[in-house]
Amino acid sequence: MRLSQKPIVILAASLILPPAGLILLWLRKGTSVFRKSLGSLAIVMVGVAHLFLFYGMHMEFSGGIGLVFSFQGGERHYRQLEAHRAAFQAPAPAIVEAAPAAPAAPSKAESVPAPASGSAYWADFLGPGRLGHYDQKPILTDWPAGGLHQVWKQPVGGGYASFTAANGLAFTIEQRRRDEVVAAYDIRTGRERWTHSWKALFEEVLGGNGPRATPVWEDGRVYALGAEGELRCLESATGKLIWNKNILADNGASNLHWGMAASPLVVDGKVIVTPGGGHGNSVVAYDKLSGLRVWGSLDDQAAYASPTLATVGGRRQLLVMTAKRAVGLAVEDGRLLWEYPWVTQEGINAAQPIAVAANRVYISSGYGHGAAVLELTPRGDGFQTRVIWANNRMKNKFNSAVLHEGFLYGLDDGILACVDVESGELKWKGGRYGYGQLLLASGHLVVLTEEGDVVLVRAAPEKLQEVARFSALQGKTWNIPAISDGLLLVRNEVEMAAFRIAAD
């Protein structure tokens, strides 16, 4: 067996041999300091190159733009992923790449028994209402010393999408080599049930590679959006293609620097997406059954936050962040109901807008910008806006806050914070969780840190109270967790896992 096939030997050689060579070099007599210095540089360069070439080490960036060296991902990871899937699948044809002109093209499906039935509670991005709240059943708040019970854990493709779940299946979208792949997994076992793929590879040095938007489930269909704008409607039981559109090409829009990241929103028979095209093509609605265009609105460049449905000021409306403002749009035709300028230093809005009262909306951005609560008052066929408060006490970068009993909890540039939603007053701030994500369940915050730890924090305004913590994933973790049928689902660029979090 070649040395490159023995990772432990390679790592040991890379870590031990260069220092040994340096020691021997500097102990050698009769060699000038200049030659020893050149030799030392050569040894270090060879050692580092060895790690990059043979052990898969690569450079990536944290959410704070800090340089991180990682041994995860790359060719070695793809081989592990493919070997794992092959080992756990019944004999089946190879993945069939569905062509745009062939809406009936089948996806790869297993000839094995169907998964156990389950609910469709967490069928949307961030759960019901896109609020990040799990209320289906109580969660365990007294965790064992070693952490929650692990139900399953396995490799996964790249990207930053979360999970949705319905009828015993968990859905996500991944990068596998040069394909974007929508995958359905048995939520109880982690076994892959079907995949549907197309050619696409979005790459970005700072932000990483792969799809970002989370697929959503509605009435037996999965709606998935790739990082390069490919929108697909699939049968949720089989992965069979129903229809597809590239929302960038269809609306004359250019891709964002960090890729398409906003999850589709299905409402009133329409699929709402944000391609960011001009001439009324910034926010677009397609018919959920046929994929035909229903309406288009605005001329703004897109943001990274996902559209949200909420009732504010007595009117059911779409809350949308664009690159330069927060807006409310009429569901039926996309008509602008209100707007509020919201321009960040980097032109990036990635946190979800939240309806925090009958007539109030919370918005936030990172990059030193901050947060605000807007009050909407009916005026004519729309609303006028008034700022209740605005400050920099909560800067949600590419994670979103949750509201609990009058207080907002969120990551303020990587540090957990609690803010009074009425006044904007900072109640506490502490604990470094990196640019991770969080959910609210049973009066507690379930935080998935940037380093892959799962942390339980009591949602209380008095002080930061960390209850429990355990390591769930290895490597940089920006993906939002999901909770369905008592299981906590987590993933990052290289692995995915399920943990039993239900109290019963």
Q: At which residue positions do the language-model features occur?
A:
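Short loop/turn segments immediately following the C-termini of beta-strands
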Residues: 67, 74, 127-130, 175-177, ...
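Loop/turn-rich, solvent-exposed surfaces of beta-rich toroidal or solenoidal domains
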Residues: 369-371, 393-459
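Hydrophobic, aromatic-rich membrane-embedded alpha-helical segments
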Residues: 7-26
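Short coil/turn segments that connect the beta-strands within blades of beta-propeller domains
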Residues: 167-168, 219-220, 268-269, 315-316, ...
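Extracytoplasmic beta-rich repeat domains
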Residues: 147, 151-164, 195-216, 244-266, ...
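Aromatic (tryptophan-biased) beta-strands that constitute blades/sheets of beta-rich domains
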Residues: 67-155, 181-183, 188-204, 240-253, ...
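Internal/C-terminal transmembrane anchor helices
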Residues: 35-58, 72-73
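Blade-level signature of beta-propeller repeat domains, shared across WD40, Kelch, NHL, RCC1
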Residues: 369-371, 452, 476-504
